Swiss-Prot record:
Summary of the function given for this chain in its UniProt record: The heterodimer acts as an E1 ligase for sumo1, sumo2, and sumo3. It mediates ATP-dependent activation of sumo proteins followed by formation of a thioester bond between a sumo protein and a conserved active site cysteine residue on uba2/sae2.
Biased composition (Acidic residues): 582-594, 630-641
Domain of life assignment: Eukaryota
Modification note: Sumoylated with SUMO1 and SUMO2/3 and by UBC9. Sumoylation at Lys-236 inhibits enzymatic activity. Sumoylation at the C-terminal lysine cluster plays an essential role in nuclear trafficking.
Gene assigned in the entry: uba2
Record keyword Cytoplasm present: yes
Organism: Xenopus tropicalis (Western clawed frog)
Active-site residue numbers: 173
Name this polypeptide is given: SUMO-activating enzyme subunit 2
Start and end residues of each stretch annotated as Disordered: 546-641
Disulfide bonding pattern of the chain: none
Binding-site residues for ATP, renumbered to this chain: 24-29, 48, 56-59, 72, 95-96, 117-122
Length: 641
């Protein structure tokens, strides 16, 4: 405990008696736990739902190969106790969003330190700390970039005060009918995995979209196609999974359906190909006859890094067949009704997506990608740098010491940059902003306006897409402000299930209606004003109006913001939590560079816009939100899930 002896007496006592909650035991979490006990913090609780994977071992130093498959939180506790046996550590192998961890649970702690890897959990912890009145230290890293900030109720902005850029999405008809970029094919392949082996989702259909308006000369033709049934080639007669099951997941039949028959059907939509190069169907038998031709390449591909090699189309077909057989066996072992979950670190699942995506790229005349590239794009991977995690975890502890000293006004949002700014600083501290009076989370009376079509939005969509996904509620209850207190949604299981498939207009909800949404777990109430519109954009179900735009700021430093994660190699690392995991794991808005842009240029602009803080070279964040640094488009890092 060398550090605690260097602290002032009162602070040292506060350190030794305080109780902290660390949420996350991954890249930052491991470094943070080590720093905390070496500083003198001995009363710690750590929670993490994940288990240890081999890919974690290169930077999460509390774990060893023998720990693979075990709880991160439990092993982190055991490892820390080896060099600090006097520590009192409680480990939870669980999701922080579990209702057991309510406001009373959070009130046990002096402060909370986040080391998370998904936006939904960050939002939830933010709200729980606000409800409990407990200071929160938020953090994240992405490669060489990092960020730390402090959230304190009524004093600073909360995590949700500023809008976060939404994930990049693609129209369904582009994915299914007219892919033009490799990422379109990779998204399609991930959808295909779920349609065949996982949980089916109507929004992730992979068969040709026969109702694509672009494929018809007029809207009536699109409607006629959509209503077609029981005709030769009508791919909507049965679901993809039903058809695959009926064939016993025969790889060759699957191949010919997906890459020959469906492509031939697409070619019948001739209007799609008047200004595009038409796809070229593939047939298993023709590729199989060329199998010997690919042997030379396959042998040469063994040289160097295997995952960096781009396979030819025949090799991709063979990889597709092999992965289907392996995944089929995994399903059989799990039993009837079982489902698989796609994981970038599961070799058969990754092989399947790599093969299927590349075959589709070949069909649509795109350059095929290596397994490494596909994995990066499919998993939204940002290379992890262990030293970045170490620096950020150290900054978390320093901000925590300021809070314990009662010097919250000295707390800062600190950015770690890839290159020194014009002042030759890698660390750029900014003063904390006050709460946003328009924030729909921490405002005195949280209120928001949502534009939607009341005749199309169902109660289920309101609950899942708007309340849970957009506004990060866990178990919402919704009451219509109609003078009667009509209950639209109840968190009690089964109580309002009959409402789920009904349009909200059926309950008298119209333009200017108000809904009161409560989440008792989060101790959070949100008033929702309904703005009805008959003219919503295509593929847009709703839009948040006002200070929290659905698409985020006009020109945010999107790459740098969305890339900030918990230091894992995957900004969207799969979690077994039922919560919606977001691949664009965000923290508070940042003004540092994107990985591909010029850090010096951005910070030069910053210097001209911002004042110095007393006694230190810092940057005020009062104008931070107006800064619009140039951002280079990077289609290789895209949020998918």
């Amino acid at each position: 405990m060398a550090m605690i002896g260097a602290l002032p007496k009162e602070l040292a006592e506060a350190v030794s008696t305080s109780r902290l909650l660390v949420v996350g035991a991954g890249g930052i979490g491991c470094e943070l736990l080590k720093n905390l006990v070496l500083t003198g913090f001995i009363n710690l609780d750590v929670i993490d739902l994940d288990t240890i994977d081999v890919s974690n071992l290169n930077r999460q130093f509390l774990f060893q190969k023998k720990h693979v498959g075990r709880s991160k939180a439990q092993v982190a506790k055991e490892s820390v106790l080896q060099f600090c046996p006097e520590a009192n550590i409680t480990a939870y192998h669980d999701s922080i969003m579990n209702p057991d961890y309510n406001v009373e649970f959070f009130k046990q702690f002096t402060m909370v330190m986040n080391a998370l890897d998904n936006n939904a959990a960050r939002n939830h912890v933010n709200r729980m700390c606000l409800a409990a009145g407990i200071p929160l230290i938020e953090s994240g890293t992405a490669g060489y970039l990092g960020q730390v900030t402090v959230v304190k109720k009524g004093v600073t902005e909360c995590y949700e005060c500023q809008p976060k850029p939404t994930q990049k999405t693609f129209p369904g008809c582009t994915i299914r009918n007219t892919p033009s970029e490799p990422i379109h094919c990779i998204v399609w392949a991930k959808y295909l995995f779920n349609q065949l082996f996982g949980e089916e989702d109507a929004d992730q259909e992979v068969a040709p979209d026969i109702a694509d308006p672009e494929a018809a000369w007029d809207p009536t033709q699109a409607a006629e196609r959509a209503n077609a049934s029981n005709v030769d080639g009508d791919i909507k007669r049965v679901s993809t999974k039903q058809w695959a099951k009926s064939t016993g997941y025969d790889p060759i039949k699957l191949f010919n359906k997906l890459f020959r028959d469906d492509i031939k059907y697409l070619l019948t939509m001739d209007r799609l190909w008047r200004k595009r190069k038409p796809p070229v169907p593939l047939e298993w038998s023709s590729l199989h006859n060329k199998e010997n031709c690919s042997e030379t390449q396959n042998e040469s591909s063994l040289q160097g890094l295997k995952d960096q090699k781009v396979l030819d189309v025949t090799s991709c077909a063979q990889l597709f067949s092999k992965s289907v057989e392996t995944l089929r066996e995994q399903l059989r072992e799990k039993g009837n009704g079982a489902e698989l979950v796609w994981d970038k670190d599961d070799p058969p699942a990754m092989d399947f997506v790599t093969a299927a995506a590349n075959l589709r790229m070949h069909i649509f005349s795109m350059n095929m990608k290596s397994r490494f590239d596909v994995k990066s794009m499919a998993g939204n991977i940002i290379p992890a740098i262990a030293t970045t995690n170490a620096v950020i975890s150290g900054l978390i502890v320093l901000e925590g010491l300021k809070i314990l000293s009662g010097n919250t006004e000295q707390c800062r949002t600190v950015f770690l940059n890839k290159q020194p700014n014009p002042r030759k600083k890698l660390l750029v501290p900014c003063s904390l902003d006050p709460p946003n009076p328009s924030c729909y989370v921490c405002a005195i009376k949280p209120e928001v306006t949502v534009k939607l079509n009341v005749h199309k939005v169902t109660v289920q969509m309101l609950q899942d897409k708007i309340l849970k996904e957009k506004f990060a509620m866990v178990a919402p209850d919704v009451q219509i402000e109609d003078g009667k207190g009509t209950i639209l949604i109840s968190s009690e299981a089964g109580e309002t299930d009959a409402n789920n498939n009904r349009k909200i207009s059926e309950f008298g909800i119209r333009n200017s209606s108000q809904l009161q949404a409560d989440d008792f777990l989060q101790d959070y109430t949100l008033m929702i004003n309904i703005l009805h519109s008959d003219e919503m954009e295509k593929d847009v179900d709703f839009e948040v109006v006002g200070d929290v735009p659905e698409k985020g700021p006009q020109k945010p430093s999107e790459q740098s913001v969305k890339n900030i994660t918990n230091g894992s190699d995957d900004g969207a690392q799969p979690s077994t939590s039922k919560a919606q995991d977001q691949d664009d794991v965000l923290i508070v808005d940042s003004d540092e560079e994107s990985p591909s842009s010029s850090n010096a240029d951005i910070n030069m602009d910053s210097a001209s816009l911002k004042r110095k803080l007393p006694e230190e070279e810092t940057i005020s964040s009062t104008k931070r939100k107006r800064l619009e640094p140039p951002v280079e488009e990077d289609d290789d890092i895209i949020a998918l899930d």
